[in-house]
Structure formats: C-alpha cells, structure tokens
Amino acid sequence: MSDVLFIEGGRVIDPAGGVDGVRTVVIRDGKVAEVAERVERPRDARVLDARNRWVTPGFVDLHVHLREPGQEYKETVATGARAAVAGGFTAVCAMPNTKPVNDCAAVTELVLARAAAAGLARVYPVGAISKGSGGEELAEYGELKASGCVALSDDGRPVMSSALMRRALEYARAFGLPLTVHEEDLHLVGKGVMHEGAAATRLGLKGIPSQAEDVMVLRDIALVELTGGRLHVAHVSTAGAVRAIREAKRRGLPVTGEVTPHHLALTDDDVAASGYSTDFKMNPPLRSADDVRACREGLADGTLDAIATDHAPHSAVEKDVEFDAAANGIVGLETAFSVCLGLVREGALTERRLVEALTAGPARVFGLPAGTLARGAAADVAVLDAAAEWTLDPARLQSKGRNTPWKGRRLAGRCTHTIVGGRIVHEEGKADR
C-alpha cells in the first residue's frame, strides 16, 4: 500500500494560503505535497474521507500548562499532548511554571524528550523570564534558546519590577525571543478572587479591578517603545488592554495579544450563576459583558492575534474547596474549537477568522513552522465536524484535569481526525496513537 495519504472531499480552510473551498490534500513523506481541486490518485492510496468536514492546518496553542516536571498528578507532557490532539491542536507551547521552573536547559530538554516519547502533538517549551520566576534576576536566555525555547514568560506571575522588565525586553531582543507576559498589578489585585463588579458584591467575594491588567499592559507597551523588544500579552481579558494593544499596533510597535475561549464566552455573571463553582475561577478572572464584547471585537479585527487556551489542569484536591482557596484555571484543549465555534454561530466571528486565530495567527506570533497547508509544509492537519453536537462528560476527557465550566453542556463541533507529520494521531472514537 502507498504511504501517500489523500484527504478528499473536505472544505479546506487555510487562511495562510488564501484557500477556502472543497479540495484534496495530498500528504507524502510527512509533508503537504499538494492541495488541489482535482488530483489523480493510485488505487492503493490511503484515503481519508472528509466530506462534510472542514480540513484546516493543525491548531497552534501559545499557552498551555503541561505540569511536568514536578506536578505529574495534574498532567504530564504525554496526557497534555493527548488532550491537544483530541482537540485538533498539533502544536502547543508549554509554560515554564513547572517544579522546578523551566529556567535552564535541563528542564527544557526534559520537556522535549517527554514530548518526543509521546509522539503526539509538537511541544515548544517556553522558558522563564527570571530565575525561578522569582522576578529578581534574569534567566540565561541564550541557554534557553539554544536548548529549544521559543519564547520567555513568568506566566502565573507578573514581572512587577519595571527595571527588570526593561532589561528582559532588551536581553530577549538580542536573542530574537518574544516575552509572553501575565499582566496584573499585584498591589491592585490584593486578595481579590474574581472580577470587581456587582457580581462579586452579591457573592461577597473580593474583586480584582480591570485596571490591574490595564496598567501593566500600558507599562509594558511603554517599555517596548523604549527597548524595541517584542511583547506578547497573554490571556487578554479587559477592554482597556484591547484598546492599548490596538493603539500600540497602530503605532507600529512589536506588540501582539492572545485571548482565551473562556474570556470570549463567559462573564462574571456566570460565576454568580454557578453558585460559587470553582470551575469558574481563573486568573485573569472572568470579566464584565463589556470586556467580553471588547475581546470579541479585538479578535475579530485582528487586534488580538490568537486564541490560546491557557489549559490549566488541576486535581480535585485543589478545586473542590472554598472559592477563595481554590486554584486558578481550567482545562481547555479539548473544548476550545467547540466554544469558539459557538461564537461563529452567534455572528461574533467569521469561520475564516476563527481558523486563522487557531492556526496562522499564533504561528506568526512565535515564528513557529506551523499553521499552513502550503506545499512542503509539515503535514499537521485537523479534520473537523462543524455540524456535530455533543455533551461534555469530564470523565471522557483525555486530560487528567476535569476542571471545566462546560461540564454537562451541549457544545458544537468536534475534531474527528488530527494528523501530525503525516501520521493520524487522533481519530474520534479510537484510542490516540
């Protein structure tokens, strides 16, 4: 039998190549060999019937927490990669807030080795901005880049020192690395646990004002202007942050941004409606309806470059506690497409823009070899059933985490097949390879 794979009959949506229509995708030797309306194929060729499906570049997630090393009870590189391909993601960027923190080559190399052993999604490590993510001394950026890191972050913690952030932008620029930053002023956050507003008041919970994010975004944009370093704002959640990024781009500054599905779909009123469910607790918190509207508009008009999940698995021990004491974060790799397809159905996004924000957009931000079905590109492909509807059963998730606000909800759209390097690594209804 031929080792060539023909994906036939599907609607190919490849924003990077300007393609949107029924095409055949030909994969040979792990690469995209051809995308065309008519293709002659051998009788013994392998065929994937994609009729009534979307065929897109594999999704790229700039922001996941794989927890390994040190917190394997929450997630491992292997289980996180399995969750990724189940959701259509063929490449994920692993945040450095592991134990120990990924601030050196040894941790980076361990993550890469675990990813290679899993043989599922491609994993791109993100190194720490500061040693131990302590915010006091810069990590060794040259060592981190040489060992395989594609960006730098102290995610989970802001860089509170403006002087250190300035030096980080300067140092990272010398190595061609972007900083992907968690923006919050801890002095304004205080002991807040959800968005500051009427919902927090009704629940009797301490609030976090939107300005805690806004002031840090504005500070770091000013430092970009000073240094010329590249800034990527992680999990944007406020209207003020969207405005600041839009203005920075208008001025030609190297500033990009991402937004999560939950910050596009849920508000602080959902926290109240949940009855203190800790599946609705994350950082940044779910914001107001006005903030959600601004984030949707920012994604639609390109102010925000990418959809990123901030996939953050936790154990029941860390979530099944009082709201104030619960860990922040939810799992998102297996629900991202479905949640965001809901935005398309609401008219907030076009189908093309949704695919672009999951593929070419994030690939451009970190300069990754992904997000395209161009001839010669790695054959990383997602096949999607946009008409499917399903009910989320946490017990059926591939991730170790069960912390999701969409438990028991009806969702639209499923990934039926995921291909990495020409290999089918996920097929709906079958165990992943």
From Swiss-Prot:
The annotation note on the cofactor reads: Binds 2 Zn(2+) ions per subunit.
Which Gene Ontology cellular component annotation is one that this UniProt entry carries? cytoplasm
Family recorded in the similarity comment: Belongs to the metallo-dependent hydrolases superfamily. DHOase family. Class I DHOase subfamily.
**Cofactor or coenzyme needed:** Zn(2+)
Record function comment: Catalyzes the reversible cyclization of carbamoyl aspartate to dihydroorotate.
Question: What processes in GO biological process is this protein linked to?
Answer: 'de novo' UMP biosynthetic process; purine nucleobase catabolic process
Residues binding substrate, per UniProt: 65-67, 97, 283, 314
State the superkingdom. Answer: Bacteria
**InterPro entries recorded for this chain?**
Amidohydro-rel (IPR006680), DHOase (IPR004722), DHOase/Allantoinase_Hydrolase (IPR050138), Dihydroorotase_CS (IPR002195), Metal-dep_hydrolase_composite (IPR011059), Metal_Hydrolase (IPR032466)
Does Zinc count among this protein's keywords?
yes
Which Pfam families does the entry mention? Amidohydro_1
The biological pathway it contributes to is: Pyrimidine metabolism; UMP biosynthesis via de novo pathway; (S)-dihydroorotate from bicarbonate: step 3/3
Instruction: Please state what the protein is called.
Output: Dihydroorotase
Name of the gene this protein is made from: pyrC
Listed under catalytic activity are: (S)-dihydroorotate + H2O = N-carbamoyl-L-aspartate + H(+)
Its taxonomic path starts at: Bacteria, Pseudomonadati, Myxococcota, Myxococcia, Myxococcales
Enzyme Commission number, as recorded: 3.5.2.3
SUPFAM superfamilies (UniProt xref): Composite domain of metallo-dependent hydrolases (SSF51338), Metallo-dependent hydrolases (SSF51556)
UniProt GO molecular function: allantoinase activity; dihydroorotase activity; zinc ion binding
Query: What top-level class of enzyme does the UniProt entry assign?
Result: hydrolase
Name the positions where Zn(2+) 2 binds: 155, 182, 235
Q: Keywords, A to Z?
A: Hydrolase, Metal-binding, Pyrimidine biosynthesis, Zinc
